[in-house]
Regions:
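Residue-level signature of transmembrane alpha-helical entry/exit and packing/kink sites
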Residues: 12-20, 48, 52, 87, ...
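Interfacial aromatic-anchored transmembrane helix boundaries in multi-pass membrane proteins
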Residues: 31-48, 73-102, 136-141, 145-146
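Individual transmembrane alpha-helices with interfacial aromatic-anchor signatures
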Residues: 143-160
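Conserved small/polar residues in nucleotide/adenosyl-binding loops
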Residues: 169-175
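Alpha-helical transmembrane segments and their lipid-water interface positions
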Residues: 38, 129-133, 160, 164
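Generic transmembrane alpha-helix motif of multi-pass integral membrane proteins
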Residues: 50-64, 101-106
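Hydrophobic transmembrane alpha-helices
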Residues: 2-58
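Short helix-perturbing small/polar motifs within transmembrane alpha-helices
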Residues: 20-24, 29, 70, 91-124, ...
Length: 179
């Protein structure tokens, strides 16, 4: 007798794929909604980055691999949905380096310091995006923009790092870690 598809794939795999799908949908929804909000400051490129809450959530409560998948899907689909394919180079570079930084930091920092890892990740994210912009435009002077981006990264990174444990209490997903 042939096994059902659920038994062939495995219950844990189905739950994992479902969790990744749900979190990707949440991240994309947040991304689209945030793109409709007018800039909070008159400095180009500064935004809240609220969809990063979902990636950091996945990193902490699911796995680095799941966070990576969600990040890739969100950034790729977000650039397609927004019609800004060029955004992919900036967002993917910044997002991947941010995720890698947070993965390393979270191996050594207690979960209560998630906000600190998020701030450092946000600074790395912004630095990577400016580096990509400098390479693409051949304009090294763009690095003079960094002090503003670092201030923004400290504020948004802290908010995102503090929002993840709060969001955990409102989501029911199979996770690998407790708050």
């Amino acid at each position: 007798m042939k096994k059902s598809p659920e038994k062939q794939i495995g219950h844990k795999t189905i739950r994992r794929i479902t969790s990744i799908g749900i979190l990707t949908a949440i991240a994309l929804t947040i991304f689209v909604l945030e793109s409709q909000i007018p800039p909070l400051v008159a400095i180009p490129g500064i935004k809240l980055g609220l969809a990063n809450i979902v990636t950091l959530f996945a990193l902490v409560f699911l796995s680095p691999t799941d966070a990576f998948i969600i990040l890739i899907l969100r950034v790729t689909m977000g650039s397609v949905f927004s019609g800004q394919i060029m955004m992919l180079a900036y967002s993917l570079t910044g997002g991947l380096l941010c995720l890698l930084t947070e993965m390393i930091l979270l191996k050594y920092l207690p979960l209560k310091n998630l906000w600190a890892a998020s701030i450092i990740g946000a600074i790395i994210h912004n630095t990577a995006q400016v580096a990509v912009a400098a390479l693409i435009t051949q304009t090294p002077g763009i690095f003079w923009y960094m002090p503003y981006l670092i201030i923004a990264a400290i504020i948004t990174g802290a908010f995102i790092g503090l929002a993840v444990p709060v969001s955990y209490t409102h989501l029911t997903l199979p996770t690998n870690r407790e708050v």
